[in-house]
């Protein structure tokens, strides 16, 4: 079967298994080239199939020889249709991990649901006993709330007033003006429900109650702050409110983990074109200009370079984890 790229809006709807496998291999090779990290040995990655989640899983496995369980929601291949990229990424990761003699299993389903939480906990209990690191890296536009049954949809809108700026179409290279109408209060609530910290806290509570968290466990979620040019639509918009909620949740989770001497952190990562970020107007144009400057300065890093630094220099550096005045780990410091 010959796979041609097919586009829908900003998303390429077809993926190439060999390209995905090569991407995974390149990341593994990078981690191996950087040497061992004295990190966690039993790791759960929620949102493990693309972007920062996939790179976190690769860093744990090939940097620290960790056993990993990955949770994600991806489409397998069907008649005449390739699988989603995350499906191929995860298949390639498992193949490479098993080849290296590492434990790696995955659960494909809705991480927001009670059912997938239970399946994951059963697997941890049966195979690993406990985990000493939980990475939370979900990027989803919708969330069915497991307790209320309400379907929440996140939106990317400014708060209070209309936002206008330039953006770029990646397919044509054309720069155009884009305007986004302000959100309603309901939009803010829905976006917090999908992208805030509630589900992260639910995972940690469930794992703790089932005695599946090891002493001194760490849990990390990912965030982005960005520049003033994207502030109105990003950090001071609906998504920013969700990120504020996520960051506040880290402190609540740290309180929950006190009895285990555990800690929760939010890591602020650098701007990247990922499936998640390319959906945001203005961001593609900002990032394309930013990349040029960072590459000239030698400071550009993909997801794997950032995660290698997070694990080696921040989380598992042999002493205290460096944070800023708000308690955030800053990977966007370079």
Report each predicted region and the residues it spans.
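A glycine-rich helix->loop->beta "capping" turn
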Residues: 119-148
